[in-house]
Amino acid sequence: MTHWITLLAVEKVAKEGGLFDLDATLPLMAIQFLLLALILNATLYKPLGKAIDGRNEYVRNNQLEAQERLSKAEKLAEAYEQELAGARRQAQTIIADAQAEAQKIAAEKVAAAQKEAQAQREQAAGEIEQQKQQALASLEQQVDALSRQILEKLLGADLVKQR
């Protein structure tokens, strides 16, 4: 029985209104919707859009600034690396020059020491030769003196003087 009451109520409503009634509610709802859209636009959408646009601009500026700083840092790093490589090459050149100079000085000192040693050897050989000659001369005199003494003892002093 309750179903019959519900069906009768539905039939009565369906006969009266149809799809919708054209009265003052529809234009009033449209005005309310437009008014709500204007209020929301003024109070929410425009400030929110401005905030989003400001944030996008801030992010874009920071990104551009970061890219500029990165490129400057890369350029500075490259310049530093080039300067460092130049300094290394210069240091290697200085080291090589110093080593060559040290070898040259060492070779000169060795040559001078060899010359000095050779001169000392020659001087020592000369002194030895001179002492040898003096020793031979001294020995010759001693041999002559001894020979005379022997002859004097053997032959006598008078015979040796006649000769």
Curated annotation (Swiss-Prot):
GO function term, MF aspect, one: proton-transporting ATPase activity, rotational mechanism
Assembly notes: F-type ATPases have 2 components, F(1) - the catalytic core - and F(0) - the membrane proton channel. F(1) has five subunits: alpha(3), beta(3), gamma(1), delta(1), epsilon(1). F(0) has four main subunits: a(1), b(1), b'(1) and c(10-14). The alpha and beta chains form an alternating ring which encloses part of the gamma chain. F(1) is attached to F(0) by a central stalk formed by the gamma and epsilon chains, while a peripheral stalk is formed by the delta, b and b' chains.
Membrane topology recorded in Swiss-Prot or TrEMBL: Single-pass membrane protein
Family from the record: Belongs to the ATPase B chain family.
Parts of the chain that traverse the membrane: 28-45
Main localization of the protein described in the UniProt heading: membrane
Native source organism of the sequence: Nostoc sp. (strain PCC 7120 / SAG 25.82 / UTEX 2576)
Lineage, broadest ranks: Bacteria, Bacillati, Cyanobacteriota, Cyanophyceae, Nostocales
Record's function text: F(1)F(0) ATP synthase produces ATP from ADP in the presence of a proton or sodium gradient. F-type ATPases consist of two structural domains, F(1) containing the extramembraneous catalytic core and F(0) containing the membrane proton channel, linked together by a central stalk and a peripheral stalk. During catalysis, ATP synthesis in the catalytic domain of F(1) is coupled via a rotary mechanism of the central stalk subunits to proton translocation.
InterPro entries attached to this UniProt entry: ATP_synth_b, ATP_synth_B-like_membr_sf, ATP_synth_b/b'su_bac/chlpt, ATP_synthase_B_chain
CC annotations in GO: plasma membrane-derived thylakoid membrane; proton-transporting ATP synthase complex
Protein's UniProt name: ATP synthase subunit b'
